[in-house]
Design a protein with these regions (language model features):
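Domain-level signal for soluble alpha/beta catalytic cores
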Residues: 1-352
Length: 352
């Protein structure tokens, strides 16, 4: 069985990474929306394993440990700091179990994960030291549990992304580092998206790019510029929602679809985004365009589901286990072309 490293795989073609665990696990009934703490690894590990395997079946080459928001400060917020290490190790063990039982002829890569701490304060040494400690302990656990790569993601402060990369680079593992700017073309500390990515490459990021917050329409223009400038591999993992030039992220995305029962809070985020979901063809088109630009590390973040991950994989020319079950309207009773289908039913399609 082949067991290539991340960079070798990227040098030879696309690598698919399923993210977006928060939303999908919440939809499956195993996580509280808004709070978004991944207790599932302790409380319902089978549910987490099932999602990993569904993503694997759909074509994800990377099994990313679900430790997003599973850091010390978030665990303090919910009063469960004592469960910090057990939660992280449980998530890593589940991911490793899935990664080492691949469906194809090559091992999957298990990824340790660190992300935005929501504790960062610009020009605050105490904040920086605390964030460094948070990242370092999570990286140490990931290495100890056999991670093949490390992913740092969803950073909206450039300096926090630099710190995350520094901590990850203390290991010998390949690093993926992605930023998630809000509605502007710069991060919260005023550094442009392009300059942040250039700096991350210069500091040794093996794969640099963007994830989360923005849908395909408002992420792809930035990815085009990043790909033009960076020499390293580039990552693109948008959310699966129809963000616009007026509303570049999903945080203030309006529902203009005739909703008669809006969410009880001010925004559609995070519990009423469903009407703005991209369809599979939009996601496939994004993946194809990004891949044609030379972006080989691709996936979906919030809003990801196995069907959409399959679309990403197939859009870049891959055949995955789930390809067996892709759409087939040939035998649909009203839209199909099978000779056994009744004409008077098919003729009614425009009135259905």
């Amino acid at each position: 069985m082949k067991n290539r490293g991340l960079i070798e795989r990227l040098d030879h073609g696309p690598v698919i990474c399923a993210e977006g665990f928060l939303f999908e696990i919440e939809k499956r009934g195993y996580l509280s929306s808004g709070e978004f703490v991944p207790m599932v690894s302790l409380e319902n590990p089978n549910a987490l394993e099932n999602l990993h395997r569904d993503f694997q079946h759909a074509g994800s080459d990377i099994v990313q440990a679900f430790t997003y928001n599973g850091h010390r400060e978030k665990m303090r917020v919910i009063g469960k700091e004592d469960l910090l290490e057990p939660l992280n190790r449980a998530a890593l063990k589940v991911a490793k179990k899935v990664a080492t039982s691949p469906l194809g002829d090559e091992q999957n890569l298990m990824a340790g994960n660190i992300s935005n701490s929501n504790l960062w304060k610009p020009n605050d040494k105490k904040s920086k030291l605390e964030v460094e400690k948070i990242f370092r302990e999570m990286v140490d656990w990931a290495v100890d549990e056999g991670a093949d790569i490390l992913i740092g993601e969803t950073f909206y402060y450039a300096e926090e992304a630099y710190v995350a990369l520094k901590i990850m680079k203390e290991t010998d593992l390949p690093t993926v580092i992605t930023v998630a700017p809000y509605g502007q073309s710069f991060l919260r500390d005023g550094v442009s998206i392009i300059d942040t990515c250039k700096e991350l490459e210069q500091r040794g990021g093996d794969v640099v790019g963007m994830n989360c917050h923005r849908g395909p329409n408002t992420m792809l223009p930035h990815l085009k510029e990043i790909r033009k400038i960076l020499k390293c591999h580039v990552a693109g993992l948008p959310i699966s929602y129809r963000t616009t030039e007026k509303n570049p992220t999903f945080f203030n995305l309006p529902d203009n679809n005739g909703c008669i029962c809006s969410s009880p809070h001010e925004t559609t985020f995070p519990t009423a985004l469903d009407p703005m979901q991209c369809n599979r063809y939009e996601i496939g088109q994004f993946a194809k365009e990004a891949y044609n630009l030379g972006i080989n590390y691709l996936g979906i973040c919030c809003g990801a589901n196995p069907m959409l991950i399959r679309e990403v994989a197939e859009a870049v020319g891959l055949t995955v286990p789930a390809t067996k079950y892709r759409e087939n309207l040939e035998n649909h009773y009203m839209y199909g072309k099978n000779k056994r289908l009744l004409k008077h039913i098919k003729d009614y399609r425009s009135k259905a």
